[in-house]
Each structure stands twice: as C-alpha cells, then as structure tokens.
C-alpha cells in the first residue's frame, strides 16, 4: 500500500527498524498472523486505572485496531537497550533522587512506568536519538509515512494504555495526523521465535472525533487524555510531561479537522 492511500484509510504499512528482517516460513496455516491477534477488549479499553509497579508493557499487546501498526525491529535491539540500562543505571538512580525535588508533570511522567530509573534512561536515550538524527521532524518522517506537504506541529512524551500495560513513547501531532511510536520495541511470538516490534498508532486528522481530558478520582495527579476516532476506536494516553499543552493542541486538532 502507498503512504498516501494508507493515511486516507487510517492504516499504514509497517516499516522495518533495520534493513534485515527475520526470515519467515514458506507456508502458514490459515489462522497465521505475523503478530498476536487482536483482543476485542483492547479496541475500546476501559479508562486506565492507577498503574501498579512492574505493569508497563514489555510485550506486544494484541490489537485488532485499524490504527495500530507494529514495525519490526532487529532481534538484538533489546539487548542493546539492556546494555544501555546497565551502563547508565547508577547515573539514572542518582538523577531520580534529584528528580524528587521537581514539581509537576515530569515527575508524574517518570512514575507512570514500573521503574523511575528506566523511564529516566529511556527519556535520555530518546533525546540522544532525536539529536543524533537531526530533530523531531526528521525522526517523525523516518518513522511514519508522510505526505509531501505534511508538517510536524507538536511532540509529547507520554504513555499509551494497552491491554499489555502502558507503553512509553512519543505522541506526534502533525498537520495531517496524530501518531504515536514506542521508545523501545516490544516482544511477540512468531512460532517458537521471540521477535521485537515497535508499537505505532496513526490516526489521520480527519478521523478524529473527540478528545476528552480526565483525572483519576483516586489520585488527582494521574491525568489522562481519551482520543476517540470517528469509527469509535478509543485510545488512552497518560503520563504527559506537558499535559495542559497536549490537551489544548489535541482539542484544536479536532476542531480544525474533526467532523
């Protein structure tokens, strides 16, 4: 499928994270799927609950959602991530002690995942990647199929709620779409093999129906944004560093492009 045609229908084809991909069997059974089949409960998930320690996703959630598009990653990617976590673990631990003195959403963003240190390291790694590759605009266009005149408007570090747990990544808002990509690849099974894939969501701007901010009744510092497509698929985002700005930008996108 071409990039432009896919954007019109809310679907994009996955783009490999590396030149090489795992070899696939020559023949498959009739119920074969390249990644776990969708769980109907994940199409319209309930409002997120407070996330217990250790709940962040490391495996690919089962999705039937037309806006979800996994993107294969090399098998050794997670090994590199683990090596980085090991090398930077002590530095991250020291940094998070100082982070306790910081107010507002950034600390809440770090606490959304199972490990403050891991979240901090992921943010550092993501920032390094952005700098190395020439900024968010270039990373956005490398990660997603974009139209020639498409411009990136905003980016937000956040988590996406899934049936497998919250997924840490970056939300991208452009002139043509709302998109999300995980910072790290998630694992999934293909036969006996464990493979890795980045978790991506793409909603064309003209498919946005509503954006609803909400706050947890249990802990008012837990804030969420519910995004609904015109065909009633729901996505719950949380752990924003700049929550108010994200709400404002998303609601403006609905007003500009929505039905």
From Swiss-Prot:
Pfam family, one: GRAM
GO cellular component, one term: nucleus
Positions of region (Disordered): 1-79
Biased composition (Low complexity): 13-30
Residue ranges annotated for the GRAM domain, each copy included: 138-215
Disulphides: none
Domain of life the protein comes from: Eukaryota
Compositionally biased spans, kind Basic and acidic residues: 1-11
PANTHER family xref list: GEM-LIKE PROTEIN 2
Family statement drawn from the similarity comment of this UniProt entry: Belongs to the GEM family.
Assembly description: Interacts with AFH1.
Protein name: GEM-like protein 1
Native species: Arabidopsis thaliana
